[in-house]
Amino acid sequence: MGKPTGFIEYDRQTAEAVAPKERIQNFNEFHTPLSKEEQQKQGARCMACGVPFCQSGMEIMGMTSGCPLHNLVPEWNDLVYTGNWEQAYSRLKKTNNFP
């Protein structure tokens, strides 16, 4: 479930994007990855809702919500939070075989 108080303790962090003029120079990722420690903090923010809308890709009032791949987000967040990286990757592969 992550950390029960994680949503309150940790602010949401998103990966910084490389400036467009810089990223058109190559085919590298254009978001700077968060550190493993920061990824674990973000995993701790999961509240394990009774009905987790985060794992169902849907449109609500014209805006996309949730995961369009139907990833098992709460389980994955908990695995990231506890540092079980291989199991977290395995969990993602169940719904997304990655290119």
Q: Across the structure, where does each feature detected by a protein language model lie?
A:
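Ferredoxin-type iron-sulfur electron-transfer modules and their immediate structural context
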Residues: M1-P99
